[in-house]
């Protein structure tokens, strides 16, 4: 307990400066720095970044720095077709990203765990709409952190039909582990895009959380959502001619720098893999869990064969 308090105080002190930073100005600057087309500088940026962060360019669709017109094209690079196989079980819920597990588990009293001893409110995270949050009360969640070195495209954990997308303005605090442990209610305060899909597990919320230096957030159906940075929420329904359907493992969006994805499922729909825990690395396409119906069917088979 004492160590937890000491670490929380340390991380809070280390995060204080972020309250004073011109977060949007710095993020806009990063947007420009990663999209210039000065060939020699782009090549230098890519080589230095790959060396410092240990990026494996061999698994990318294009492996040479010369193949990228600007740094952001490299940062959001596509991978080779065989680099991230999608778990072949029809009942598997797969990781939508490369990254690491920040937290994973059940919602308690409509709250999601942010860090040990800290939680935040489901309704606030989803934009203040009680009706939007209602199906997820008592459900399951997984928070996945993408560091700068990770592959930055976001994919579908299940096949789904997009129901709605909501942009929510907010701060742009870092989402690094130390900041998550040092700034209370961070994910419900930061800029984010809430996407709700209809899936075979019921509704699925995928929350794309912005952060400082995240030059922009994109989805495959709406394109670049930020910038420009807005001061008011923006809500869009996708019905009729606007209907969007995506397969499991299909790309749904991307971060143009590192950030966080939060998955939220209704109660009694998903069983997480037992070995998963906080700080564990994951790769896009690997199974995170299994649909409850599939778990129940397997148990019934075991009893029948006993």
Curated annotation (Swiss-Prot):
Keywords, alphabetical: Cell membrane, Decarboxylase, Lipid biosynthesis, Lipid metabolism, Lyase, Membrane, Phospholipid biosynthesis, Phospholipid metabolism, Pyruvate, Zymogen
PTM comment: Is synthesized initially as an inactive proenzyme. Formation of the active enzyme involves a self-maturation process in which the active site pyruvoyl group is generated from an internal serine residue via an autocatalytic post-translational modification. Two non-identical subunits are generated from the proenzyme in this reaction, and the pyruvate is formed at the N-terminus of the alpha chain, which is derived from the carboxyl end of the proenzyme.
Pfam families: PS_Dcarbxylase
Residues where Pyruvic acid (Ser) is found: 259
Known role: Catalyzes the formation of phosphatidylethanolamine (PtdEtn) from phosphatidylserine (PtdSer).
Biological source species: Nitrosococcus oceani (strain ATCC 19707 / BCRC 17464 / JCM 30415 / NCIMB 11848 / C-107)
Tagged with keyword Aminoacyl-tRNA synthetase: no
Catalyzed reactions: a 1,2-diacyl-sn-glycero-3-phospho-L-serine + H(+) = a 1,2-diacyl-sn-glycero-3-phosphoethanolamine + CO2
Cofactors named for this entry: pyruvate
Gene: psd
Protein location: Cell membrane
Protein name: Phosphatidylserine decarboxylase proenzyme
GO CC annotations on file: plasma membrane
EC number: 4.1.1.65
